Amino acid sequence: MAITETKTKYGQVHGVQKDGYTVFRGVPYAKPPVGEKRFCPPEEPACWEGVYKADHFGCVCPQTEHEPDSFYGKEFYLDPEFGMNQSEDCLYLNIWTPANAADEKLPVAFWIHGGAFMHGFSHESEFDGAAYCERGVILVTINYRLGVFGFLAHPWLSEESGVGRSGNYAILDQIAALKWVKENIAAFGGDPENITVFGQSAGCMSVQTLVSSPLTENWISKAIFQSAGGYDTGLNRDMPLSEAETIGQEFVELSGAKSLEELRTIPAEKIVELQEEFGRVNPSRMLSFVPNIDNHLLTCGYNEAVTEGKIKNIPYMLGSTADDIGVFPEMKEKGEHGGIYKGCINWSLALEKLGRKPAYVYYFTRALLGDDAGAFHSSELWYMFGTLGRSWRPKTEGDYALSKEMMDDWTNFMKTGNPNAEGKDDWKPCTKDAPYVQVLDVRK
């Protein structure tokens, strides 16, 4: 029977027993970033007395909910079982473990959700750890601060910090969660020396930020980029702290706050409303709450981090979907249809140029049934998490076979740094002489 109760650095925790695994839901990895802690880096959680009942998912960061009849509302957010209670008190993680004892040292998969840094949460209907547990991998999913809550930079905040920087709280949340996992996952049967960080869209951009940051040295064993990462993709934005502060000043002016004290007393729901208004009034600022180069979390731009060899020297797997670009109208208008795809290949070739192991690159081309959206941005998630049964879409035996193939590929990579099963080499690394890309689709 999988571990049901265990002791962390902060206290005893009890999970929910399932068939062959246990899920620990809503475990705090930081203090609630509320009140005076709004717009501050995360702090270690307080220790607790007794047994923490990890039987329900934590609240999610305040955000605008998708309309039920919108594309993504229908795709991922209709099931009430996966609804979201919103609160700034949102820094929680979830753990799915099949381990029967704390000394098993199973590989760990650390998932960061996407959503343009404005939406999303750790327990969306497409995320689940059951299939990974079946394959001997522990899955961790996290909530982190979003939008203004996660990225607001401002001269007031930079001065208050005492070190002349602000913003990036969302990524610092992710680092705090990663540190928590590094320090505590052994109690759940995990190997703290074998952690694969992976994410999709904004989650992928987060992963690329983490492997480019000096703050995560020796914490990440492997990384998977899904639909946004790579070299020269046209997506990752090199935002100087000064620009982030200017955007923050514009937002604060819109809010009417005359001081940090006032800014911190604005209700969370009002912040979300102001965020939406800010995007309408300043369309060019719609996706401006992103990581900034503060000479702490990031010391240079994303492409420079690659060319200068500042990224982690670890195994990488990365890819895109055939219709990813549909959610990036600015790239579509420029005709950059292959930007993300090419960026994945460019990343692997850059690794090779640095004298490192080239990456494994994939291209997901399955056009999902039910409409004409094709292999849309995030369509691979149902497959690589093994949650196709939760989707409203029609499926074929080929879809389930593809899902099994992808779950095997992902978990093989998490175990060994190679997506191939032991003794096989069907999926080859992408090199200058042989730029191999694994196409993921149903078998004809």
Model-assigned labels for residue ranges:
Residues 222, 230-235, 254, 258, ...:
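Substrate-gating cap/lid region and adjacent catalytic-acid/histidine neighborhood
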Residues 75-76, 80-257, 306-326, 356:
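Serine-hydrolase-like catalytic core of hydrolytic proteins
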Residues 145-148, 198-202, 362-371, 425-432:
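Short, solvent-exposed turn/loop segments enriched in Gly/Ser/Thr/Pro and often Arg
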Residues 10, 173, 191, 293-294:
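Acidic/polar residues in short coil/turn loops that connect beta-strands
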Residues 428-444:
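C-terminal domain-tail junction helix/linker
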Residues 132, 212-216, 370-376, 429-431:
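Short glycine-biased active-site loop of nucleotidyltransferases that positions the nucleotide triphosphate
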Residues 1-168, 192, 283-285, 397-406, ...:
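Non-catalytic accessory segments of hydrolases
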Residues 22, 88-91, 172-175, 179, ...:
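A structural signal for well-ordered alpha-helical segments within the folded catalytic domains
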